[in-house]
A protein has these predicted regions:
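A short, well-structured edge-of-sheet supersecondary motif
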Residues: 1-12, 43, 197-198
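Active-site-proximal beta-strand/loop segments in catalytic clefts of secreted hydrolases
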Residues: 1-2, 49, 77-80, 113-114, ...
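Active-site SXXK
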Residues: 5, 16-45, 206
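Structured C-terminal helix/loop/strand segments within mature extracytoplasmic catalytic/sensor domains
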Residues: 7, 91-95, 136-168, 172-179, ...
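Short, well-structured active-site flanking segments
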Residues: 32-51, 99, 148-152
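Acidic helix-start/capping segments at beta-turn-to-alpha-helix junctions
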Residues: 41-57, 92-93, 158
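Conserved catalytic neighborhood of penicillin-recognizing serine enzymes
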Residues: 52-88, 124-127
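Mid-domain, small-residue-enriched loop/turn segments at the edges of structured enzyme/sensor domains
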Residues: 86-143
Length: 222
């Protein structure tokens, strides 16, 4: 509960595979770079065919073209586009993103690699996070304690339009899903979701991370 400060967790500090949830700290780091004038949302970025990554998202379906940095961020967030995430990592640098993660005092989160082709099963280096760290990211956005409040709210608003709402939001009635900002993550045996919920009862964060689930249906319904 972001207003009262009450929290409950189970294994909330266990470092686990982040999957697509890693795109949340990547986006925060990008917005911080824009705030610090190290990047500009209107910068044009060309995405070439050999840079495209199979998996979630849509950029890999298009011919080579230019995108603004803002467009890449939005596509990365609302469609969990892997190619967009990799271009942003290239622009910011993995070291800078991890420095921003440390600046937010997130002790169990680390970007270890770019996103990979989802057809590859032998990737043994993973990006890591914890349920507590993901909830803390929402708290930073809500309170304006890393980004300014305007930019924090902008990111919350973008994630409200996130198109993959088939995990935690599956259990919420359709007319309330507009009150949820979320970032999902999944890969073989992993089903993750982190949410910011805002309604008349208050402002809440809710995160579930899972590993070694036998299949995606089991991971979603349990």
């Amino acid at each position: 509960d972001l207003r009262s400060g009450y929290s409950y967790g189970y294994n909330e500090n266990v470092s686990m595979t982040a999957a697509g949830c890693m795109k949340l700290p990547i986006a925060i780091s990008l917005i911080k770079a824009v705030e610090d004038k190290r990047a500009n949302f209107m910068d044009k970025i060309k995405v070439l065919n050999d840079e495209k990554v199979y998996g979630t998202g849509i950029i890999h379906e298009f011919d080579d073209r230019d995108y603004t940095l803002f467009e890449l961020m939005v596509i990365m967030l609302i469609q969990s586009d892997n190619t967009a995430a990799n271009k942003i990592i290239d622009i910011l640098g993995m070291e800078q993103i991890n420095e921003d993660i440390k600046s937010m005092e997130l002790k169990n989160t680390k970007l270890n690699r770019k996103t990979a082709d989802e057809r590859m099963l032998d990737v043994n280096i993973e990006n890591m996070t914890s349920a507590y760290d993901l909830c803390m990211m929402w708290k930073h956005l809500y309170n304006g304690t890393f980004l300014n409040k305007e930019n924090g709210q902008m990111l919350i608003d973008i994630l409200e339009r996130q198109q993959i709402k088939n995990k935690l939001a599956l259990y919420i009635q359709d007319d309330l899903k507009s009150e949820i900002s979320s970032k999902t993550g999944d890969k073989l045996s992993v089903e993750n979701d982190t949410e910011y919920i805002h309604n008349e009862k208050g402002n809440f964060t809710f995160t579930v991370l899972s590993e070694k689930v036998p299949n995606s249906v089991y991971g979603t319904i349990t």
